[in-house]
Amino acid sequence: MSQFINNPEHTFGFDTLQLHVGQESADPASDSRAVPIYQTTSYVFRNSQHAADRFGLADAGNIYGRLTNSTQGVFEDRIAALEGGVAGLAVASGAAAITYTLQALAQAGDHVVAQKTIYGGSYNLLEHTLSQFGVETTFVDAHNLDEVEGAIKDNTTVIYLETLGNPNSDIPNIDAISEVAKKHGLPVVVDNTFGTPYLFRPLEHGANIVVHSATKFIGGHGTSLGGVIVDGGNFDWKASGKYAQIAEPNPSYHGVSFAEAAGPTAFATYVRAILLRDEGACISPFNAWVLLQGTETLSLRVDRHVENTKKVVEFLIGDSHVAKVNHPSLPEHPDHELYQKYFPNGGASIFTFEIKGGQEAAWKFIDHLQVFSLLANVADVKSLVVHPATTTHSQLSAEELAEQNITPSTIRLSIGTENAEDIIWDLKQAFAALDE
């Protein structure tokens, strides 16, 4: 147990946890204070019994590089601590984290209830890819609790949400939905990529599992892919009888019951031992190390993102070229009350606005930006822009786009940490180009 977690003498703050958890003292092999990159594929066992104990989960430790790595382990422990979870699992990308989580919970013949206003890639995963494996999804208006509960079936096994919807930053009532889930014995999975554990911790509001694209705010610099699954350790996998793969003896791992063997970390252990083992979307030690560097400054960067976003939103609502700003800090936004509840210190530095003039004006505006980069990533220290309808959400049908409130006029901004005056100057000069 980390000396920085559940310390009886002192409660450590977020800024301290993001620097220390996972490596509380110097590296024992080298005395290095910085976390080393353990660039290896495999590990030597002391003897045959030691090897058998590792594979049998009787002895925690490294088995093979596809499953665990010491650099990766520090990263996993740190993100789990920041989210308030009991275990973390780092994988190759955010998409892998989401896919493995849903595969672990929804198998052939099962049903998922999902928020309809989510990242286009996650929508496609649920609507098209997982459906090929016999998993059905009902997409719901997460603001309508009756609709959420009405969508639950006898074979429903998970409710899937995003803290801040992509791209419009709409906010589900996670507390209320979690109560519905508990009533039906279902786990709630929340993608907290846009929320960040610094601003919001879903596990404190009833969620059971949190996923991240660590590529975004956690890494923060647009250099390295990675994803994280955080196990809240707060769901009873045996109670409902729906999760035999976790609760009952698993024939794929010589009859181990992960609920029995791993206790509160059963979910993370199952995903690592079965899905990561078999499907192999493991994170590289180098990427885990790079993402650790980002984690150490997460709170510092997010504060600047939030500060700049407030100034940009204020500018946009006063510009004549803008038809609407979709930011939950604004009183007219339908999720303003939830924003005030969940994000008292601000948030949602990734949001959209509607430009007057449709797609032609949107493209012209985007093409004249100089500080903003046109690319598909978000949550970078650099300011970013994209046209969702023709890029990130282009696989959606016209009807699906309408359900997600994405139009040809929608522009998504990801506000970086540059000087706010420079960001606003760039927006001004791109708007001016529309008048030429």
What does each model-identified segment do?
Residues 164, 193-195, 330, 356, ...:
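Active-site beta-loop-alpha junctions enriched in small/polar residues
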Residues 47-99, 121-128:
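Conserved N-terminal alpha-helix of the aminotransferase class I/II PLP-enzyme fold
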Residues 60, 86, 287, 291, ...:
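Short amphipathic alpha-helical segments
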Residues 3-10, 22, 26, 89-318:
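Conserved PLP-enzyme active-site core in the AAT-like
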Residues 280, 302, 310, 314-317, ...:
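Conserved C-terminal alpha-helix-loop-beta "cap" of PLP-dependent enzymes
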Residues 2-69, 77-78, 411:
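N-terminal "arm"/small-domain region of PLP-dependent enzymes with the aminotransferase-like
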